[in-house]
UniProtKB/Swiss-Prot annotation:
InterPro entries: Snake_3FTx, Snake_toxin-like_sf, Snake_toxin_con_site, Toxin_cobra-type. Keywords: Disulfide bond, Secreted, Toxin. This is Weak toxin CM-2. SUPFAM superfamilies: Snake toxin-like. GO terms for cellular component: extracellular region. The keyword Secreted applies.
Length: 61
């Protein structure tokens, strides 16, 4: 299973058990964006502008 990760923003193989890709962005002036692999989707927080969780290779591009 592969997902895009930050800070490199390249597709990488996820560790065993982490079969969800995610992307989240903050409500900040800089528009910080984090991408990677997780075992379960993080909970949405009010400081997030955007949260995506998906189960298809590289779906968080």
């Amino acid at each position: 299973f592969t997902c895009f990760t930050t800070p490199s923003d390249t597709s990488e193989t996820c560790p065993d058990g982490q079969n969800i890709c995610y992307e989240k962005r903050w409500n900040s002036h800089q528009g910080v964006e984090i991408k990677g692999c997780v075992a379960s989707c993080p909970e949405f927080e009010s400081r997030f502008r955007y949260l995506l969780c998906c189960r298809i290779d590289n779906c968080n591009k």
